[in-house]
Amino acid sequence: MIDKDMNSACMRGGSVRTLNNYQQVMEPRSPHTAWQFGVSQIVKREPMDEDKNDSGVTSGSDFHSSSPSSDTSQDLQHSYQSPQTQPARFYSTPIVPHFAYNHNPLTPPNSEPLVSPKSEKEEKDMETTLTPCASPNRKPDDNQDHLRRLEMSLEKSGLFSSKTSEHSVDELSGKSDNDAEEYDEQSLRVPKVNSHGKIKTFKCKQCDFVAITKLEQWNHSKVHIREDKRLTCPKCPFITEYKHHLEYHLRNHAGSKPFQCNKCDYTCVNKSMLNSHMKSHSNVYRYSCRDCSYATKYCHSLKIHLRRYGHTPNVVLDEEGNPCPDIIIDVHGTRRGPKIKTQPKAEEAKPETLPFLNLQQQLPFPGYPFFGGFPNAQLLQQLIRERQLAVGGSQEESRVLDLSKPGCSYTGEQKSRRKGPAFKVDPTQVESEEEDEETSTTVFSNVEVVQEEAKKEESDSNNNNNKEEGNSCQYCNIAFGDAVLYTIHMGYHGFHNPFTCNMCGVECSDKVSFFLHIARVSHS
């Protein structure tokens, strides 16, 4: 409530002015904008008592009267000037409310008081008078507590060894930030979390040891590396037995990364890392699983998938997406990357082993266009070559001797053959008379015709027997005129189930579906 004495006086800018000479435009004494009334001053902070309300105005029994007449008193003049003569402190003696809040009679009593911004000098004075309990810097303690909680959680889960826990967090946090070597050592002692939110582990390639920090991994490596072959880093506890590994590690310390990607800003220390990075710019997934739809760009990821689920790898693709049958995936091997398949020697390859070789290379066959191809072109060509040599030798043995040539002689095998049923040869006539020589030539030509016809009948009968016995598939009831085609066809039949494809593992119900499968599906 405004007192009756306020009829002729009002508060403006902390001083009393009469309303007789009221001006329309009232300029505040403050150098700030027009909406900020009252001189700038430091607002004191006081503890909230039970007898105080939310507005900050206390009862008249505790403090001086809040009437305008009391504002002109000497005590209030002194209390108003006290913030300028004495430094402001926390929990100091209370002041008059309307001086503290720059009370303006033109504003409602219950409204929020407007406080003008503080000048640079006043802010500096306030900073000097603040007690240390205002906002202490607890960042090192927070980091230290965080590391302690991480150690305790790791020790409870059994992932943190006792050797690592001996190096306390106090030891790590007490190191200087200017010392790069100590900072690196601190980062090596603290476990890291991967992108999946799990603690990153380091597995030993020679035993079952698993470490959660680089420092533990390097200390364990001393067990597998002899002392005369150990190569250590002069700046950190890194240890290896390979010179190029130490060279790459020292490049990381020096910040030297000579290999740079031509498509982005990526840089690395060796060519292998750059090749692995370049796969991220490619859309070809070279490695895939045969048993499911899993595909990846990295060979190591496929090996992990195959070991985890027991699946088999599919054909590896090259950088352009074409199949590479010479590249195989060694699932349980320790060597990084795929392996190049070694080709068997020609003399070691046998026709009997052809159906059981699980090879992917194909060779088109012009006689049977419905076949996508036949496995192992090298062995197939070798088999055809050997068969041609065998057929050529038998043709030379069965060739009829030309008796008109004087240098030829009979062999024991040729003497026992038939000479023809109704002809008799007199050698004396051949040597004495020219006419008889022509007659004998005609006679022997007849003998040659008889022998060729007899041999043809024998070969036809033998071929028919082979078709019925040797070159006939008992599962599909198909007779093959060539041993090569028969061998290739039998290679598609499974060992336990004849209607299971030996190349891809597809099970068919009967011989018709099996024949259609091997005829239509390209086994690449």
Swiss-Prot record:
> How is this protein annotated for GO cellular component?
nucleus
Q: Name one GO molecular function term.
A: DNA binding
List compositional bias (Polar residues) regions by residue number.
Answer: 76-86
Answer whether the UniProt record assigns the keyword Repeat to this protein. Answer: yes
Record localization: Nucleus
**InterPro entries according to UniProt:** Zinc_finger/UBP_domain, Znf_C2H2_sf, Znf_C2H2_type
> Low complexity bias: where?
59-75
The biased composition feature labelled Basic and acidic residues covers 118-127, 138-154, 164-178
Chain positions covered by the region annotation Disordered: 42-86, 101-187, 402-442
Zinc finger (C2H2-type) positions are 202-224, 231-253, 259-281, 298-311, 471-493, 499-523
Pfam name, any one: zf-C2H2
Chief localisation class:
nucleus
Tell me, what does this protein do in biology? Gap class segmentation protein that controls development of head structures.
What's the protein called, per UniProt? Protein hunchback
